[in-house]
């Protein structure tokens, strides 16, 4: 397993403290990796800053060609990446290979094309004898912090638009799940000029803080928790860096009486529990109108009970383990608190799985109330709650009564209602009669404490640029 850092085009061993990397399916240590030292963090940023002088002036065509080459080598090494992701994260191998690798490749190919379509506004003479034009230029060095739930996917979301826009990047994957990012570094070093991509390993305090606080870093992009986002925003405030934050969610799933219940059940069984529920857009907070509440709870409970947890390399496995022991305890505590309310009923699941690994049973909780913690706080596990509602006005208010604002869905056969409700929901994305679907061409990002800035799409590319006005006297 590739365990070296990428700094200025060279693979080097970390010079800091060694940290264990676990297999969550067994709890065993896969290997130990040495963190980057403070000097290595500084060297990576300075290498990126030096490389920016040339990379920032390359043509969109040249940048696109590099991104396309990277997409090709990821595709060629898809099985290797899927196996690493499965071992390090506990994902079912078939899901990593069939679902995630193609999407990751597509992200790089999309931004390769988008790089050649990013234009400033060619303006005119707004002052006599002067011509104005608008440019969109890269910022410089971008520090990208990727999470542990989709390590390679999130690395792609951060690297592709930043590089396409002409920036240089220092990427820090989560210390829990670094293996695919380090493998990506090995392949990328022969495609991009030295210093354009740098990949470090380490914890937030030892590597993340000196990286994001470095005076030569001009932008920080994070996918992570609200607490981490708050810390980075505060930590970078003295240097007035641009920040790009995706900080989780608690997606409301609004099911009206006229919805296709079978479609809802099938959808939530998939969209609520994919990746063991470790997804910020997971369909985890169901609001069911009272006319169909009992039927939905009964049918969904039966469907969720058929989900198969198991070994990641088993083709029949639908849910793998959670990513760490600490996160398993977090999910278990949230469910135990829900049980303790007295009014929430466990329809299925509700406990850790016996044996090795960090497994939690797929869980459905009914009878949850709007103010319950299980409704208001992100669990980030295979746990879905169901709350009954009376009418459209009530459910829109309840759905918006949340600190999160990332994703939502509305299930109804009434087209007018679908439009009305979608227009009022305070979420970055609203799906109608589906959930969870993402494409490279459309933006992904939130509101409120879910953060700001967009991933994917041309909007995501623009986030990694600065708008400049150039005026020429003639």
UniProtKB/Swiss-Prot annotation:
The entry's active site is 246, 280 (nucleophile)
Cite the NCBIfam families for this sequence.
ABALDH, PRK13473.1
Q: What does this protein do?
A: Catalyzes the oxidation 4-aminobutanal (gamma-aminobutyraldehyde) to 4-aminobutanoate (gamma-aminobutyrate or GABA). This is the second step in one of two pathways for putrescine degradation, where putrescine is converted into 4-aminobutanoate via 4-aminobutanal. Also functions as a 5-aminopentanal dehydrogenase in a a L-lysine degradation pathway to succinate that proceeds via cadaverine, glutarate and L-2-hydroxyglutarate.
Miscellaneous comment in the UniProt entry for this protein: 4-aminobutanal can spontaneously cyclize to 1-pyrroline, and 5-aminopentanal to 1-piperideine.
Could you name the domain of life of the organism this protein comes from? Bacteria
The primary gene name is patD
Its recorded name reads Gamma-aminobutyraldehyde dehydrogenase
Among the record's GO biological process terms, what is one? putrescine catabolic process
List the InterPro entries hit by this protein, alphabetically.
Ald_DH/histidinol_DH (IPR016161), Ald_DH_C (IPR016163), Ald_DH_CS_GLU (IPR029510), Ald_DH_N (IPR016162), Aldehyde_DH_dom (IPR015590), Aminobutyraldehyde_DH (IPR015657), PatD (IPR017749)
Q: In which pathway does it act?
A: Amine and polyamine degradation; putrescine degradation; 4-aminobutanoate from 4-aminobutanal: step 1/1; Amino-acid degradation
Subunit organization: Homotetramer.
Keyword Signal on entry: no
Question: What EC identifiers does the entry list?
Answer: 1.2.1.19, 1.2.1.-
The Gene Ontology terms for molecular function here are: aminobutyraldehyde dehydrogenase (NAD+) activity; NAD binding
Query: From which organism does this entry originate?
Result: Escherichia fergusonii (strain ATCC 35469 / DSM 13698 / CCUG 18766 / IAM 14443 / JCM 21226 / LMG 7866 / NBRC 102419 / NCTC 12128 / CDC 0568-73)
- Protein family: Belongs to the aldehyde dehydrogenase family. Gamma-aminobutyraldehyde dehydrogenase subfamily.
Arranged from A to Z, the UniProt key words for this protein are:
NAD, Oxidoreductase
Q: Which reaction does it catalyse?
A: 4-aminobutanal + NAD(+) + H2O = 4-aminobutanoate + NADH + 2 H(+); 5-aminopentanal + NAD(+) + H2O = 5-aminopentanoate + NADH + 2 H(+)
Give the binding site residues for NAD(+): 146-148, 172-175, 209, 225-228, 280
């Amino acid at each position: 397993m590739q365990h070296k850092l990428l700094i200025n085009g060279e693979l080097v061993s970390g010079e800091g403290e060694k940290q264990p990397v676990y297999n969550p399916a067994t709890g065993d240590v896969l290997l130990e990796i040495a963190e980057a030292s403070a000097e290595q963090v500084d060297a990576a940023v300075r290498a990126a800053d030096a490389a920016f002088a040339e990379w920032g002036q390359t043509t969109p065509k040249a940048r696109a060609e590099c991104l396309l080459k990277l997409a090709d080598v990821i595709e060629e090494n898809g099985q290797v990446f899927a196996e690493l992701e499965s071992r390090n994260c506990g994902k079912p191998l078939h899901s990593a290979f069939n679902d995630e690798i193609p999407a990751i490749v597509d992200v790089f190919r999309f931004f390769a094309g988008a790089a050649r379509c990013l234009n400033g506004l060619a303006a005119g003479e707004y002052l006599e004898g002067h011509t104005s034009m608008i440019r969109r230029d890269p910022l410089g060095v971008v520090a990208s912090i990727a999470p542990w739930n989709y390590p390679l996917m999130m690395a792609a979301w951060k690297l592709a638009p930043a590089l396409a826009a002409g920036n240089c990047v220092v990427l820090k994957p989560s210390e829990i799940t670094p293996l695919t990012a380090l493998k990506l570094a090995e392949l990328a070093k022969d495609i991009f000029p030295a210093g354009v991509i740098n990949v470090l390993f380490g914890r937030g305090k030892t590597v993340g803080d000196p990286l994001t606080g470095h005076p030569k870093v001009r932008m920080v992009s994070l996918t992570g928790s609200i607490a981490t986002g708050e810390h980075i925003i505060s930590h970078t405030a003295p240097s007035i860096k641009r920040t790009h934050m995706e900080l989780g969610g608690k997606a409301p799933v609004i099911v009206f009486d006229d919805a296709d219940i079978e479609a809802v059940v099938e959808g939530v069984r998939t969209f609520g529990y994919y990746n063991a529920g470790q997804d910020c857009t997971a369909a985890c907070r169901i609001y069911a109108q009272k006319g169909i509440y009992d039927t939905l709870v009964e049918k969904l409970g039966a469907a969720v009970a058929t989900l198969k947890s198991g070994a990641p390399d088993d083709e029949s496995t639908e849910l793998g383990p959670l990513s760490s022991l600490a996160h398993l305890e977090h999910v278990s505590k949230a469910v135990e608190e829900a049980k303790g309310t007295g009014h929430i009923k466990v329809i299925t699941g509700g406990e850790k799985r016996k044996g090795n690994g960090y497994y939690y049973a797929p869980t459905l909780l009914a009878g949850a109330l709007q103010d319950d913690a299980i409704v208001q706080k992100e669990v980030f596990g295979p746990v879905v709650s169901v709350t009954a509602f009376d009418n459209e006005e009530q459910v829109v208010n309840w759905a918006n009564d949340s600190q999160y604002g990332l994703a939502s869905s509305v299930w109804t056969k009434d087209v007018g209602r679908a439009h009305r409700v979608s227009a009022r929901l305070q979420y970055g994305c609203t799906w109608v009669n589906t959930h969870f679907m993402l494409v490279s061409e459309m933006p992904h990002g939130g509101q409120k404490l879910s953060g700001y800035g967009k991933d994917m799409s041309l909007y995501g590319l623009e986030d990694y640029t600065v708008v400049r006005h150039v005026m020429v006297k003639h």
